[in-house]
């Protein structure tokens, strides 16, 4: 029996748009409106050449997407080592690799699940976060969940990745509207800025044109979270998922906190 016809299916957690199952060494998922575009994207030569990007095998006999399963672990629980500096640098480097590999991808007749943003510099992953990264022994070996990919500016992706991995969030023990102090973030102000600057410098590498400022990144992250909050609110109305309004509220609170942080700085 071929891989494309294997009947044994194991449910997997995750997936932004559709249910996901494991069949042999492939991931199968009900296609979204953007699946044809995502297939083209993952098969784009410079993207397919990245060893940590899964292969897209097309669609199985049931019409589901068939994507290579990446061996490793996805850490939704955020282990302590996730905040080590070498992880921060890896995320920045991988994001830069992804962006550079998407340059030149033909947008003709493409369909995306999210609206493209201007300027159209690269194809943003739009959810480049620890829960979509596959690790082996604290090394990134894979990126998953491409449902939210869409054209946009580099900083749009950079800001969200920084929000997740620096992280640019207040501590859960204090009100989000509190003016940032050394006790209102997982990091004190100096350390937060240091980690964000390190992330931005690693992403830019030798290209000074890609070195974004801390202030611009935080401002963009705040805007990004408001857009995400609006998207989450719409999804909540459409799905009646009781958890989504909680997430929407969190994104709005975090966005306001980032505005306050920038104003204080």
Annotate each predicted stretch with a short phrase:
Residues 213-217, 221:
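Eukaryotic Ser/Thr/Pro-rich intrinsically disordered, low-complexity regulatory regions
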Residues 77-81, 150-152, 169-174:
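Short, polar/flexible loop-turn hinges at active-site or ligand-entry regions and domain interfaces
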Residues 158-205, 224-238:
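Active-site activation/catalytic loop segments of kinase-like enzymes and analogous catalytic loops
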Residues 97-108, 130-134, 149, 164-171, ...:
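Alpha-helix capping at helix-to-loop junctions
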Residues 226-265:
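ATP/Mg2+ or Mg2+-diphosphate-binding catalytic cores
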Residues 1-14, 260-264:
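Actinobacteria-biased recognition of intrinsically disordered, low-complexity terminal regions
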Residues 8-125, 129, 136-139:
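ATP-binding pocket architecture of kinase catalytic cores
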Residues 122, 129-168:
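Catalytic activation segment of kinase domains across protein kinase-like and atypical kinase folds
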């Amino acid at each position: 029996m071929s891989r494309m016809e294997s009947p044994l299916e194991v449910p997997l957690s995750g997936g932004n748009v559709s249910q996901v199952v494991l069949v042999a060494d492939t991931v199968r998922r009900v296609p979204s409106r953007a699946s044809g575009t995502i297939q083209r994207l993952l098969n784009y030569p410079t993207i397919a050449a990245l060893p940590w990007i899964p292969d897209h095998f097309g669609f199985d006999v049931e019409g589901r997407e068939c994507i290579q399963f990446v061996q490793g672990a996805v850490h939704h629980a955020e282990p302590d080592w996730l905040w080590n500096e070498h992880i921060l640098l890896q995320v920045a480097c991988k994001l830069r690799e992804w962006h550079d590999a998407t340059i030149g991808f033909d947008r003709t007749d493409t369909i995306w699940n999210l609206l493209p943003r201007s300027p159209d510099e690269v194809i943003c992953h739009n959810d480049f976060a620890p829960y979509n990264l596959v690790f082996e022994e604290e090394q990134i070996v894979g990126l998953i969940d491409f449902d939210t990919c869409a054209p946009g500016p580099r900083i749009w992706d950079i800001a969200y990745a920084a929000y997740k991995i620096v992280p640019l969030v207040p501590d859960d023990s204090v009100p989000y509207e509190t003016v940032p102090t050394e006790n209102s973030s997982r990091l004190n102000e100096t350390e937060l800025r240091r980690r964000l600057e390190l992330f931005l410098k690693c992403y830019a590498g030798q290209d000074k044109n890609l070195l974004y400022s801390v202030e611009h990144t935080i401002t963009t992250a705040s805007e990004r979270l408001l857009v995400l909050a609006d998207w989450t609110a719409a999804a909540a109305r459409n799905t009646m998922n009781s958890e989504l309004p909680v997430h929407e509220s969190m994104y709005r609170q975090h966005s306001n906190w980032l505005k306050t942080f920038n104003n204080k700085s």
